[in-house]
Structures are given as C-alpha cells and as structure tokens.
Amino acid sequence: MPDKKRRVTDFVKGGGPYVWVTAYDYPTAKLVDEAGVDGILVGDSLGMVVLGLPNTLGVTLADMVRHTQAVARAAPKALVVADMPFMTYETGPRDALRNAARLIRAGAEAVKLEGGSEYAHVVEKLVKAGIPVMGHIGLNPQRVLALGGFKMVGKTEEQKKKLVEDAKALRDVGVFAIVVEFVPASVAKEVTQSVDVPTICIGAGPHCDGQILVLHDVVGLSERTPSFAKRYANVAEQILSAVRQYVQEVRTKAFPAKEHYRDV
C-alpha cells in the first residue's frame, strides 16, 4: 500500500507486484485510492462500462478529459493514467501531442496508448515532450473491428514474436510500463523477461510485474465478468436490494419517517 504519492519513476522492474485498477469518477476513484492501489487507469473502457457502448470506439477525447478531471481530484496517492481514445494519436505525433496535453492538463500524470512498434515514433515524441507514456500490447480493444472481436492474441509463433518486438520497441522509446492484455501466460512471461520496464497484465497470467482489472468486474457491477477477472463482491445485488427497499418504503409511505424531515 503506497504511503506517499506514486510517480512514474516509482514503477521499476523488480519493484512490484504493482496493483492497478480502472476508475471513471470521483467517488470510486476516492475509494480505490484509499484502498491502496498503486495506479488508477481512467480507461476508455468507460465507453462499455459506464456509457453502455458496444466497444471503446465511440469514446471521445472530451469524454476522457471530463472523467480524468474527476478521478484526478480524488486520488492523492495513486498514479493517474488516462487512455488516449480512438483516433487521437493514430494520425501522427502532432495530433498526439496536442491531445495528450489536454489529458495532462485535466490531471493525468501519464497517458496510455494502444499499439506496438507502428506507434513507437508517436510515443517517442510524447516522451521527449515530457509526457510519460504507458504502452499497451496484446489485445488492443480499439482494433476490435479489425480483429473480428475481443480475441486472445499471441497464440501463434508469429504473433508471439511480434509481441516481444513490440515490447522492445516501446521500451526503446521510453515507456515507463507496458500493459499486456489477453495473451497466453507463457507469452506474457516471455514478454516480461524481454524488457526492463514493468509489465502490467490483464488476462495474461501471473508472470507480469503487476495486474490491472476493471473496477466494475472487481466489485460485481458488470453485467458479465470476464473469465480472467475475479469478482470480490456483489455490489450490484446490494444496490438492487437497497433501491427496491426504497421503492417499497416510498410507495407504502414508510419513508420519509419523522427522523428524515423537519417541521416548523
């Protein structure tokens, strides 16, 4: 549990295991920060988790700025990283710099972008401009249309080789950490051993330098929990129970009771 503010320089190889979780608003970010996570990702997964979209492609930079502002206000200890959403960096370093700067001004202390060696030149420009970058290889949700769905990556020798090459390319241009998503555990282990920056797994086994999960999966608010996630609570049932009781008490006029209001 961090007892001081986490910085990107605190994330070093061999210093983990590092604990990351997503958060998208002030109250949940405040809770996970108090719980002692090392890092909070304001993920573009908010499109699916919070906004009800079928994937992350509809998330805008304005969405990310607003949610990053809320999370940053609530997290005095954890490192806050914001996702760069679809088509905010693919068009080149100039656009990436301008868009990343908006997220930094919103309170992010680093940005995360998906992709490997094909975006190394973009990452390099951001890092040289003083913007810390977290890489993201393996399953890239922003490529879901090209991939034909949310499918495991790294099952072939060619894919495995590409993942290792991508990790090294991102390491070479200065990322401080790399998310490795939904790849075989043995491949994640090889990727982790190939670079001297921390790897953070999601659905990629125990061999990375840390783990990250979507908060709603952790607390039981998701409609469906992925096979690689663990549900530690059932908050959805608690909310349902509480609101159903509220509905019943209002309709039977049991609420508000005398202690809930004042009279002159």
UniProtKB/Swiss-Prot annotation:
Q: How is the cofactor bound?
A: Binds 1 Mg(2+) ion per subunit.
Enzyme Commission code(s) on record: 2.1.2.11
Q: Which domain of life is it from?
A: Archaea
Of the GO CC terms on this record, one is: cytoplasm
Pathways per UniProt: Cofactor biosynthesis; coenzyme A biosynthesis
Q: What is its main location?
A: cytoplasm
Positions binding 3-methyl-2-oxobutanoate in this chain are 44-45, 83, 112
Q: Which residues bind Mg(2+)?
A: 44, 83, 114
Per the UniProt entry, what are the Gene Ontology biological process annotations, in alphabetical order?
coenzyme A biosynthetic process; pantothenate biosynthetic process
Which InterPro entries has this protein been placed in? Answer: Pantoate_hydroxy_MeTrfase, Pyrv/PenolPyrv_kinase-like_dom, Pyrv_kinase-like_dom_sf
Q: Which reaction does it catalyse?
A: 3-methyl-2-oxobutanoate + (6R)-5,10-methylene-5,6,7,8-tetrahydrofolate + H2O = 2-dehydropantoate + (6S)-5,6,7,8-tetrahydrofolate
Where is the catalytic site?
Answer: 181
Query: Which Gene3D superfamilies does the record match to this protein?
Result: Phosphoenolpyruvate-binding domains
Q: State the Gene Ontology terms under molecular function.
A: 3-methyl-2-oxobutanoate hydroxymethyltransferase activity; magnesium ion binding
State its role: Catalyzes the reversible reaction in which hydroxymethyl group from 5,10-methylenetetrahydrofolate is transferred onto alpha-ketoisovalerate to form ketopantoate.
Check the record and name the NCBIfam families matching this protein: panB, PRK00311.1
Tell me which family the UniProt entry assigns to this protein. Answer: Belongs to the PanB family.
* Quaternary assembly: Homodecamer; pentamer of dimers.
Quote the protein name from its UniProt record.
3-methyl-2-oxobutanoate hydroxymethyltransferase
Taxonomy of origin reads: Archaea, Thermoproteota, Thermoprotei, Thermoproteales, Thermoproteaceae
